[in-house]
Amino acid sequence: MTTPATPTRQTLLDAYFGEYGGQFVPEVLLPALDELERAYVEALEDPTFQQELDDLYTNYLGRPTPITECANLPLEGQGRGTARIFLKREDLVHGGAHKGNQTIGQALLAKRLGKTRLIAETGAGQHGTATAMVAALFGMKCTVYMGAKDVARQQPNVYRMRLMGAEVVAVDEQSGNGLSSAIDVAINDWVNNLEDTHYLLGTAAGPHPFPTLVKKFHSVISRESREQMLERTGALPDAVVACVGGGSNAIGAFAQYLEDQPGNEKVRLIGVEPAGYGLDTDLNGAPIHEGRTMHLHGSNSYALLDEDGNLRNSHSVSAGLDYPGVGPEHAHLKDTGRAEYVGATDAEALQAFRMLSRYEGIIPALESSHALAHALKMAAEATEPINILVNLSGRGDKDVAYVRQLLGDHAALDPATDVLTEVDVLGVLEELTPQADTA
């Protein structure tokens, strides 16, 4: 069955999630999107493709990833003895985050298309690292675009990318949105190098078929977690919680629970947006809460707009969530009510970062810390037994130096008694950004 990608275009697969999605791109890109969609459809029908993908998941990425129950967190209120928090350990995937799930899938498609060069945008550097990783694995050239502010706060990942042979280009953030600006520049590169280049978009946004194939490759997260929770607890989780920027890790964590399977309808799906300095300020990255619909980076979805209807700056302590838009399926899930979307502030995320590090010996990515922050809040408010599954989308090694500057003397104090309530993220970023390596 074909479906319109715009009011007049036809695609092999459904290009929309309700009213969200589509292919709102320059006409020159449409043949490349069609080519990618055909390759994806053909790959799904080719058993050798799935065999190669599964082999790489197992023997290169190290899947399946385990589930760890938090055993020592000093839960507050009713949560003590009532709530159980489980972590889906995507931080243990080779590369340090969930991103490798789909970079391997897209790189295999690029190989089928005869492409020799991969380009990508990155915020926290995790997607850039995963792209550089698969480019090295498959012997392909690689260029990664990254906002100058993000280059400054994610130096370990910048070095990792270059170590694996990638060219890292610091992007002038004219719009104030590092990740958004990096996507703009990457799309421009793709337009000018379609013959040999595949744009390995890093999130579940962008023009069709990117949201669909990114979800497919990341759905391995929830396929595993559903089976693991049944085996571990004898039941599905009461709630699955994941952070949401563009939304790739969350859509992967939700995917299997969206299928028509017994018990799925009872599982709450909760996406946590970066509330930054607060949802009542303009210093956040929460388009589902604060945004309106617009065409951004090739698809129709929610985005942060100013009073004049122009894209406005986003803000988050975590570079990977500092994006003014969100993937179209998340917009649809919000509208239908199948998923809930909440916010966690910079301070709440940093507090969760400290708690998991101090009490469980697991240093989470700042992105994942937003999801953990909401899980801790749910646990504190629980009045009856509840099993909460948090998608720990990445590890926090990349954030340690940055967090050290943010926390100062708080780093050595017990977070259970020294509760962080505010933090001067913008002040630290202003000090960091001039040091960005723009080579």
Curated annotation (Swiss-Prot):
Source taxonomy: Bacteria, Bacillati, Actinomycetota, Actinomycetes, Mycobacteriales
SUPFAM superfamilies found in the cross-reference section: Tryptophan synthase beta subunit-like PLP-dependent enzymes
Cofactor: pyridoxal 5'-phosphate
A single cellular component GO annotation: cytoplasm
CDD domains: Trp-synth_B (cd06446)
Protein name, per record: Tryptophan synthase beta chain 2
Family statement drawn from the similarity comment of this UniProt entry: Belongs to the TrpB family.
Pathway field: Amino-acid biosynthesis; L-tryptophan biosynthesis; L-tryptophan from chorismate: step 5/5
Subunit architecture: Tetramer of two alpha and two beta chains.
